Amino acid sequence: MVDDSQDTTHFGFQTVAKAQKADMVAHVFHSVAAKYDVMNDLMSFGIHRLWKRFTIDCSGVRRGQTVLDLAGGTGDLTAKFSRMVGDTGRVVLADINDSMLKMGREKLRNIGVVGNVEYVQANAEALPFPDNTFDCITISFGLRNVTDKEKALRSMYRVLKPGGRLLVLEFSKPIIEPLSKAYDAYSFHVLPRIGEMVANDGESYRYLAESIRMHPDQDTLKAMMQDAGLENVEYFNLTAGVVALHRGYKF
């Protein structure tokens, strides 16, 4: 049993060694990669598309800019940003998981998104980019899977250009109590069953439900972003706080 709190972290409801978590999360996403898009639609009843659209609308991305879609998975945001930045801009789709990165690359190439998109396997805690590289960074439903969130936020801050913005789209804490109870029931009882039926992997979706519950609430994440150096941090509750979009700037 690991009992040194400085060397442990959460994997869902489990307490594990920090050195173990990345491999455990990797196993989850290797397992779910092939069914990731289908499961997103089923789990959220398609509403994830609206959450991502709102994120894009809040990004302020313009033609010619450089964007990092971190933990970008199958590339939903990258596809939109690619059109927004145009031929003179650049989008980097980065993910720590090579299975997810492969799915994203294949999906985007199949729909004709080529030319201004690069693919990088990267750990959010140690981004392999120079200081002041990106006009905008988004991380969509990825931060809760990171072992050291504070370190990752500092890494994102470092590679943002002055005037750049970071947007974190993530599951959060419902602000309506009856909804919170219903959401818990759905997450812990229905979601794993859907995962078992569709992806033949109920355990991975049980972890995903648990990881949502262990993720910091809206105000805690706001404070974490401020501690990383971001300014003018604000958040927007979506679907009554089931999801929140946090936005902060580097000045």
From Swiss-Prot:
Coiled coil ranges (UniProt) are none
Q: Reply yes or no: does the keyword DNA-binding apply.
A: no
| GO MF terms, alphabetically ordered | 2-methoxy-6-polyprenyl-1,4-benzoquinol methyltransferase activity; demethylmenaquinone methyltransferase activity
- Name the chemical reaction catalysed here: a 2-demethylmenaquinol + S-adenosyl-L-methionine = a menaquinol + S-adenosyl-L-homocysteine + H(+); a 2-methoxy-6-(all-trans-polyprenyl)benzene-1,4-diol + S-adenosyl-L-methionine = a 5-methoxy-2-methyl-3-(all-trans-polyprenyl)benzene-1,4-diol + S-adenosyl-L-homocysteine + H(+)
EC number per UniProt = 2.1.1.163, 2.1.1.201
Question: Can you supply a Gene Ontology BP term from the record?
Answer: menaquinone biosynthetic process
**Keywords in UniProt for this one?**
Menaquinone biosynthesis, Methyltransferase, S-adenosyl-L-methionine, Transferase, Ubiquinone biosynthesis
For the ligand (S-adenosyl-L-methionine), the binding residues are 74, 95, 123-124, 140
- This protein's source sits in the domain of life called Bacteria
Pathway(s) it belongs to? Quinol/quinone metabolism; menaquinone biosynthesis; menaquinol from 1,4-dihydroxy-2-naphthoate: step 2/2; Cofactor biosynthesis; ubiquinone biosynthesis
InterPro entries listed in its UniProt record? SAM-dependent_MTases_sf, UbiE/COQ5_MeTrFase, UbiE/COQ5_MeTrFase_CS
Query: Is the keyword S-adenosyl-L-methionine assigned to this protein?
Result: yes
Q: What does this protein do?
A: Methyltransferase required for the conversion of demethylmenaquinol (DMKH2) to menaquinol (MKH2) and the conversion of 2-polyprenyl-6-methoxy-1,4-benzoquinol (DDMQH2) to 2-polyprenyl-3-methyl-6-methoxy-1,4-benzoquinol (DMQH2).
Protein family per UniProt: Belongs to the class I-like SAM-binding methyltransferase superfamily. MenG/UbiE family.
HAMAP family membership:
MenG_UbiE_methyltr
Stated name of the protein: Ubiquinone/menaquinone biosynthesis C-methyltransferase UbiE
Source species: Enterobacter sp. (strain 638)
Its taxonomic placement starts with: Bacteria, Pseudomonadati, Pseudomonadota, Gammaproteobacteria, Enterobacterales
Gene responsible for this protein: ubiE
